[in-house]
Amino acid sequence: GVPCLCDSDGPNVRGNTLSGTYWLAGCPSGWHNCKSSGPLIGACCKQ
């Protein structure tokens, strides 16, 4: 998957670890959305 920025990673991509994974169809089973204001399509999820 594509790495994405969780809320816990910091305010922006610069200098922060991207600990989430971007899923186009939403978070798979056992994962949770880790970004409150995500893109309109897909979700930034964490295991």
From Swiss-Prot:
Intrachain S-S bonds: 4-44, 6-34, 27-45
Domain of life (superkingdom): Eukaryota
GO cellular component: extracellular region; nematocyst
Keywords: Cardiotoxin, Disulfide bond, Ion channel impairing toxin, Nematocyst, Neurotoxin, Secreted, Toxin, Voltage-gated sodium channel impairing toxin
GO biological process: regulation of signal transduction
Presence of keyword Transcription regulation: no
N-terminal signal peptide: none
Pfam families, A to Z: Toxin_4 (PF00706)
Localization annotation: Secreted; Nematocyst
Predominant subcellular localization, coarse grouping: secreted
One Gene Ontology molecular-function label: sodium channel regulator activity
Role this protein plays: Modifies current passing through the fast sodium channel (Nav) in neuroblastoma cells, leading to delayed and incomplete inactivation. Paralyzes the shore crab (C.maenas) by tetanic contractions after intramuscular injection.
Family: Belongs to the sea anemone sodium channel inhibitory toxin family. Type I subfamily.
Protein's recorded name: Delta-actitoxin-Ael1c
Species the sequence originates in: Anthopleura elegantissima
